[in-house]
A protein has these predicted regions:
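Solenoid-like repeat scaffolds
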Residues: 2, 25-35, 62-66
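Intrinsically disordered, low-complexity, charge-biased linker/tail regions
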Residues: 1-3, 10, 66-93
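Start-of-helix register in tetratricopeptide repeats
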Residues: 6, 36-39
Length: 93
């Protein structure tokens, strides 16, 4: 099984956690149409304050538009992506 950071969405999130917006954005752009990457893409645009663009990417990812704390959202995304990368399935995945 691949390590969690081997997934594009988690690699992008790791770049965002380092403050490397452009690197994170490039990763998700290269994986446009993959729901996990689209979710991180939405987060990135919300982080930069581009709420209209963020809303578009939340819709593409099949997610509700986030409105709460950015750090809490990032933690939620990380936990969900790590569950997925770990191969877990079911209602909590």
């Amino acid at each position: 099984m691949a390590a969690p950071s081997d997934t594009p969405a988690l690699r992008a999130l790791e770049q965002a956690e380092r403050g490397a917006f452009e690197a994170a954005h490039e990763i998700v752009q290269n994986h446009e149409g993959e729901p996990d990457c689209d979710w991180v893409h939405a987060y990135l645009h919300r982080w930069e304050g581009d709420h209209d663009n963020a809303a578009y990417w939340y819709r593409r990812a099949g997610r509700m538009v986030a409105r709460g704390d950015l750090a809490a959202e990032r933690a939620e995304i990380r936990a969900a992506l790590e569950r997925i990368a770990g191969g877990r399935t079911g209602p909590d995945a």
